[in-house]
């Protein structure tokens, strides 16, 4: 018999007066099941809802077990599917043995904030079987051979089939065993595999689930001892944190100061109703309301409050920045970004990285940055650390030059670096390191930044430590000697200047813009020139060089001689050369825009 009830609510001792007679009888029967009936099997496809409305005390108390000792600001553990896993675990634990079997959101099998959840499941169950069905369109998931990977449902979130088995055989002090199977490809292929397979016939991979992650996917941690001797990038900086989150990007971020100023004047002069109508702002959110935004602009607007803003790699736009939380900008990150209102520079790095391409992260900025400036997929956002700190002398945010500043580095870590390479850290040198570095006996804050930047872009580093770079802030090796340190400082400094569009080498343009026209971006496309493959060796293998092509912005105008590698290059999940142009569809490129489009492939 089937009863209508809310599974995530505890049984009610008295329901007879709450409902009509027929519903009261059904509720009482359901309460009897919840309270007295042993549950040996829980099966289902629980709902996925990050903003869960199921916030009853009973399930919130149960789910708290998954949140203990995480030391995370954002937990992401209140999704309904997680509550249903905890609900099922509760009833199987209560019975002493049984089976919990769900097809669900698969984020819990390798999520960083889910590590205590996985540990609790390992403590409860003897064996856990996970068929990872992948299909996560949010991170553009593909198969290992580059072919398409489809979801088994018409959703974007990846899914997995999870079977948790509890017997009375496992000791309480032991952790359960995890068996994993990965299934990728087209939807029909996955259906066929699932329809013709049983738990006994699947080729399971037994995982070694260990502290601190307890991952339910295969991880290659053979380099862990060496990697853990490196310093954690997040620990190097005294001040760091996520990028700025506007809550209304289309409204708050503009390509020109004039466009932004028009919006701000509307917020001053128009009523709330007129603002909502003109800018299609029908629904407020928790951190952004038209009333709050209007009050902020009226109280603080001035020309100096319009700031340059790194929205995406190489894409600098403009933002209104008063530093007021829940104002025109929802989450401005004032403690970090007031330091960027004067002359400064900062490094961008991820907390975790998802997607198919592994760690392709790291960027640099002289401006306030967006929460997604350095990562397209993670959901954890982009972290930013300014190199220098300024005294917070004014809440007016009026930019002043020559204000005294100091570095933003952990001196204890810096002293360890200095001791290893026999150099002295010059705490008073706050320059940007443009002088000759080959004969220096001291190093400066910018040298440390450049050293780190070179490491983050090292192909060897990215490949060797790719599993670790997926799950936490990057760790950076201590330099082994002066010679290596200065070599990497030089490489990192050159790359920094190129990425900031400050290097004179950018004037050596590698592309052309040969056709005069409207300069309006319409349909952006890349057409490779007609090449023949070059025979590489006697085995008949072919070498496909870095072909050049033309990037068309409309039917007639194009950028010529763009390398394929530059067009397809990734930074943080973005392809900057493509995204910069595609984001300007419908706009006319000015001279500076045309130069930017030619600089970006080189950078």
Per-segment meaning from a language model:
Residues 7, 34-56, 91, 100-105:
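Conserved proline-anchored active-site loop of SAM-dependent methyltransferases
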Residues 22, 80, 84, 113:
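Soluble or luminal CAZymes and related metallo-dependent hydrolases
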């Amino acid at each position: 018999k089937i009863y209508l009830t809310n599974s995530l609510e505890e049984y009610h001792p008295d329901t007879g007066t709450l409902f009509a007679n027929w519903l009261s009888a059904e509720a009482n029967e359901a309460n009897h099941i919840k309270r007295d009936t042993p549950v040996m099997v829980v099966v289902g496809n629980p709902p996925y809802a990050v903003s869960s409305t199921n916030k009853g005390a009973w399930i919130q108390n149960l789910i708290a077990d998954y949140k203990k000792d995480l030391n995370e600001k954002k937990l992401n553990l209140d999704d309904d599917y997680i509550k249903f896993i905890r609900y099922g675990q509760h009833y199987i634990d209560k019975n002493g043995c049984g089976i919990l079997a769900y097809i669900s959101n698969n984020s819990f099998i390798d999520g960083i904030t889910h590590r205590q959840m996985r540990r609790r499941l390992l403590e409860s169950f003897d064996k856990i079987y996970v068929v990872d069905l992948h299909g996560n369109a949010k991170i553009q998931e593909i198969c290992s051979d580059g072919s398409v990977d489809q979801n088994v449902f018409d959703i974007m979130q990846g899914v997995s089939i999870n079977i948790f088995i509890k017997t009375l055989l496992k000791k309480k002090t032991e952790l359960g065993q995890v068996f994993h199977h990965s299934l990728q490809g087209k939807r029909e292929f996955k259906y066929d595999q699932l329809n013709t397979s049983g738990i006994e016939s699947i080729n399971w991979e037994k995982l070694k689930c260990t502290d601190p992650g307890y991952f339910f996917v295969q991880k290659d941690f053979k380099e862990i001892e060496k990697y853990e001797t490196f310093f954690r990038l997040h620990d190097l900086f005294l001040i760091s944190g996520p990028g700025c989150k506007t809550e209304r990007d289309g409204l708050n971020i503009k390509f020109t100061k004039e466009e932004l100023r028009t919006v701000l004047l509307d917020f001053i002069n128009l009523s709330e109703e007129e603002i909502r109508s003109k800018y299609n702002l029908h629904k407020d959110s928790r951190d952004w309301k038209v009333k709050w935004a209007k009050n902020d602009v009226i109280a603080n607007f001035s020309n100096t409050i319009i700031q340059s803003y790194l929205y995406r790699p190489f894409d600098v736009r403009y933002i209104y920045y008063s530093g007021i939380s829940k104002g025109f900008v929802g989450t401005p990150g004032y403690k970090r970004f007031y330091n960027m209102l004067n002359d400064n520079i900062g490094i961008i790095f991820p907390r975790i990285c998802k997607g198919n391409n592994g760690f392709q992260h790291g960027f640099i900025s002289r401006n306030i940055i967006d929460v997604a400036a350095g990562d397209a997929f993670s959901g954890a956002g982009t972290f930013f650390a300014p190199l220098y700190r300024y005294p917070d002398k004014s809440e007016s945010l009026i930019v002043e030059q020559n204000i005294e500043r100091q570095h933003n580095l952990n001196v204890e870590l810096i002293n360890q670096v200095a001791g290893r390479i026999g150099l002295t850290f010059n705490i008073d040198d706050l320059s940007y390191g443009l002088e000759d570095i080959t004969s220096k006996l001291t190093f400066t804050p910018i040298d440390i930044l450049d050293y780190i930047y070179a490491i983050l872009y090292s192909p060897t580093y990215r490949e060797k430590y790719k599993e670790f770079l997926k799950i936490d802030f990057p760790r950076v090796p201590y330099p082994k000697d002066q010679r290596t340190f200065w070599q990497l400082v030089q490489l990192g400094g050159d790359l920094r200047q190129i990425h900031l569009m400050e290097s004179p080498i950018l004037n050596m343009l590698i592309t052309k813009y040969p056709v005069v026209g409207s300069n309006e971006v319409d349909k952006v496309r890349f057409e490779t020139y007609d090449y023949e493959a070059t025979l590489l060796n006697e085995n008949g293998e072919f070498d496909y060089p870095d072909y050049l092509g033309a990037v068309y912005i409309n039917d007639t105008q194009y950028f010529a001689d763009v390398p394929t590698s530059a067009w397809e290059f990734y930074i943080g999940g973005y392809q900057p050369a493509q995204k910069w142009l595609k984001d300007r569809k419908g706009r006319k490129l000015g001279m500076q825009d045309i130069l930017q489009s030619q600089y970006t492939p080189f950078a």
